[in-house]
Structures are given as C-alpha cells and as structure tokens.
C-alpha cells in the first residue's frame, strides 16, 4: 500500500517547509485532515507534488469527505498544503534574511517558496498558451489563460445556496492569509505575505496565484479601502521601486471599465517582467513648465503614454500630480473627451513605475471611461466587433502589452480552424458563430492550409489585440489625435503654479 501522506511529509522536508523534528506532528495533522486514525505502507518515490495531492484528494472523494468538483478539490488540497506551510512570521523572517543579501534574492526566494507550497500552482501555469505578435509598436505578448480554473456549475449552484458571511471582505484583504475558504471563496491556508511599510502604513506583498507574468506580485493595503489615483499613489509606487529596484510596480485605474476587476481594495501589481510597453521607443519629447529636470517622452504605443524620467522621485511625483489633476477636469469635445457626466468622473490615469539605472521612471497612460448609447461598455473600450476575442476591461496588464485572453478561445480557435479548413458553415455552429465575420475577412486575406492555419489564427488574434488597445486610446494615433494630445499638454503648461 502506498502511503501518500508520508510522501507529502517527505515533500515538505525536501523543500525545507518543515524540519525533521516536525515530521511526526505534520503526519498526524494530515491524518486528521484525511479523517484517518492510522497510516501505513511505504511512501512512493519520485512522485511530483501534483500526483501526491491528486491521490490524496481522490481518496477523499471516494470516501465521501468532499464532492468531486474542482472547487471542492482545490479547497481540500489547499488545506493539505496548509499543514506544510510555515507560520507567517517564519516566512517574513526568512524573506528579511534573503533580502539583506539583495532585493533580487529576497523576491526570488519568496516566489519559489509560493510555488513550493502550491499557492502558485505550477502545473496549471504550464497549461497557459503563449505566443508573440510582432506589431508596429514592437512585440506584443499574447496568452490564453488556462491556469485560473473555471467554476464548476455544481459549485456555482452550491455557492449560491450557501450563506454569505462577508469575511474576508474581498479576495485581496489581509484576512485571507490562512483562511480555509468556502465554495464562493478560495482557500488560502498556504498564502503567505510580507509586510511593507508605505507612507507610515502597513501594506503587504504577496504573489498572484495565477502568475500572468514572471514574479507577478500584488501589493495590498492592509485596510479595505477603494482604489485611488493621486499624489499618494505615485509616491507609493516610486517608494516600492526604491525597495525593489529590479521590479516594476503599477496601479490599475480607479474608475470602472478602465480599472481592474477589483476596485474596492487599494492594491498595486508588480514583478520582473519587462513588458512590451517598457521596450517601446520614444517617438517624441515634450516639456512642462517648471520641470526642466524631468525628461518627458511620448511613447510610440497604441494608447497615449507620457513617460516621466528624473533622478528625483519627488520631482516625478510633483509633475505626475500636476498632469493628473489637469486631466481629471480636462474636456475636449472635438476629441470626444468629456471629464464628467452629472458629477460622475470619467478621466483618470494608469501609472507604472520602474527604475532606469539610478533614475526613476513613471509612465502615465491617459484613460477615460465614458459610455454612450452606441458604446454602452465604453467609448474607449474594445468595440463590439472585437468582443469575440476580448470583451473584458483593459487593465494595467493589457495596457502594458500583455493580452490575457479568456480560456474559451482555446477550444473556439481549434473549432474555427477545422471549420475553415473543411469549408463548414461557421455561422451554423453556435460555438464559433461570433467569429464568422472575422473568419470571412481572414479567408479573403490568407490561403489556409493544415500547416499554416494555427499560426495565421494566432497572428490575427495578436492583430485584434492591438486594435483593442487602439480602441482604448483616448487620443488616437492620427494627425487629429496627435494634435489633441498636444492641446492637453499645452493645457497642463498653462498651470503656472500648483
């Protein structure tokens, strides 16, 4: 008989999650989770963590401890991993020791640790489909996200019946650390965070379990407070890249449609990745009165980006505040920019901070979330003809040139390819009918063969993503759009003092 509990304990020892003196204690703790009163047998050798957890979870399903939905399985195997995960203070102490050697060593250790405790599920990340699309703005990173599990209908129904308790208030709250979860809220027994002091207040750093890019981390306010963009935001972002000079750190905008999926809890995102927008070239320089020491570049990008660069973080904060405050109230009807409707604001920015050697850099992406009858989801949002590929909000990650596309596209693109190659009626197939007009356009443009069909579809998806970003641009890359951007810059320079 194989003893997978012993195998899990051995995994914890091998990855330094527990010590030898803890092994008997942890073994008995896992016995309790499994509702067993004794173990036995030998531990299988060479089994990956995924296989060990699957074996234990399968056994729990067979014995009726849990249901067989992916939600219940995830809740259960996270509980198992929680028995191996060190206490928060131990993780913090280890991070401090590693950080003292170098910031890079600190974040490398912490990221690997989060994978070792299965908070970052490495096996699921490997499922993501990724490719590069070469655009006029530079390479764009395209991914079909398969690592975030889709809700099982049974779990959705059960969650709807369950009593809502409002704890934690959201999935970003610090109270998630160690939380057992429920059908409508993920288990977090293996979540660990590192405290960070920003502007005299506690924040926490953790890694995203879905890791859309290399070392995708989240900085969250200890207090459950709404997203906000202002002077304090810029100061915090630049403080974080002072602490972690090898990281970028950015914030989603603070308004619906142009913000991220969670506006109720102030947080930032960062990581190692050098995004396409970072690599994009500067196509022009501009100047702001009173800031001769701050270089301001206009980035060649589908969306309007002002890149502020200076040796002084404080000077960047001062200029970023001026630009943002003017933009908040800026109107240009010729360009379709209306700052508010009945007192509801529309203008905001998406800021991204990084280091440029010893200098600081802050990108400000101008955003507007106005809606109309023609564009009820947003004037500066992917337009309806692109929704078959991307309908969701264009947040920080997409703005920087990483397309996070829905899982449905994996199956839909495969079905569409087969329909194109076989000459089937695409409109007659409900699963791909939304792609029909696009497919007609592609078939006029390309000669599809079994050898080239996959690559054609991938590259054309990349082209759609660029159009998505262009739709989200408040100032278009046209002569009229460039003139409108210059009018805004001129309006900022009219502010003599601030």
For the regions a protein language model found, what residue spans apply to each?
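Catalytic or ion-translocation cores adjacent to nucleophile or general acid/base/metal-coordination motifs
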Residues: 232, 241-264, 270-324, 328-331
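Active-site microenvironments that recognize anionic phosphate/pyrophosphate groups
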Residues: 1-219, 223-227, 302, 317, ...
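Helical scaffold of the NTase/Pol beta-like nucleotidyltransferase catalytic core
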Residues: 190-192, 222-249
């Amino acid at each position: 008989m194989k003893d997978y509990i012993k195998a899990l304990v051995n995994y914890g020892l091998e990855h330094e999650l527990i010590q030898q003196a803890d092994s008997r204690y942890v073994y008995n703790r896992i016995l309790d989770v499994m509702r067993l009163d004794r173990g036995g047998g030998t531990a299988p050798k060479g089994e990956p963590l995924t296989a060990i957890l699957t074996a234990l979870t399968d056994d729990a399903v067979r014995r009726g401890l849990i249901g067989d939905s992916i939600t219940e399985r995830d809740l259960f195997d996270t509980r198992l991993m929680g028995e191996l995960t060190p206490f928060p203070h131990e993780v913090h102490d280890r991070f401090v020791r590693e950080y003292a050697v170098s910031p890079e060593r600190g974040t490398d250790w912490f990221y690997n640790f989060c994978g070792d405790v299965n908070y970052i599920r490495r096996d699921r990340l490997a499922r993501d489909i990724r490719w590069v699309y070469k655009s006029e703005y530079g390479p764009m990173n395209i991914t079909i996200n398969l690592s975030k599990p889709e809700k099982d209908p049974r779990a959705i129904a059960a969650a709807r019946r369950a009593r809502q308790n409002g704890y934690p208030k959201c999935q970003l709250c610090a109270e998630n650390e160690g939380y057992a979860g429920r059908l409508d809220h993920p288990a977090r027994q293996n979540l660990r965070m590192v405290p960070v002091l920003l502007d005299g207040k506690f924040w926490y750093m953790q890694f995203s379990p879905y890791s859309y890019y290399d070392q995708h981390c989240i900085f969250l306010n200890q207090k459950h407070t709404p997203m906000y963009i202002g002077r304090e935001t810029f100061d915090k972002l630049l403080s974080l890249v002072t602490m972690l000079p090898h990281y970028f750190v950015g914030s989603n905008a603070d308004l619906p449609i142009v913000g991220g999926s969670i506006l109720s809890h102030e947080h930032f995102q960062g990581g190692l990745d050098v995004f396409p927008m970072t690599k994009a070239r500067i196509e022009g320089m501009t100047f702001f009165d009173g800031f001769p020491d701050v270089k301001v570049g206009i980035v060649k990008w589908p969306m309007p980006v002002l890149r502020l660069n200076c040796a002084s973080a404080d000077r960047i904060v001062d200029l970023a505040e001026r630009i943002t405050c003017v933009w908040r109230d800026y109107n240009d009807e010729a360009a379709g920019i209306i700052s508010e409707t009945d007192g509801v604001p529309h203008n905001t920015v998406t800021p991204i901070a990084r280091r440029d050697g010893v200098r600081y850099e802050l990108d400000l992406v101008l955003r507007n979330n106005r809606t109309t009858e023609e564009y009820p989801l947003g004037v500066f949002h992917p337009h309806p003809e692109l929704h078959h590929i991307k309908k969701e909000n264009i947040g920080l990650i997409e703005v920087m040139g990483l397309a996070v596309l829905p899982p449905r596209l994996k199956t839909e693109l495969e079905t569409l390819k087969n329909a194109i190659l076989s000459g089937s009626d695409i409109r007659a197939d409900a699963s791909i009918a939304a792609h029909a007009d696009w497919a007609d356009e592609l078939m006029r443009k390309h000669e599809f063969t079994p050898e080239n069909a996959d690559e054609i579809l991938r590259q054309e998806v990349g082209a759609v993503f660029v159009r998505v970003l262009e739709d989200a641009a408040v100032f278009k890359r046209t002569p009229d759009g460039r003139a409108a951007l210059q009018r805004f810059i001129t309006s900022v320079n009219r502010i003599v003092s601030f």
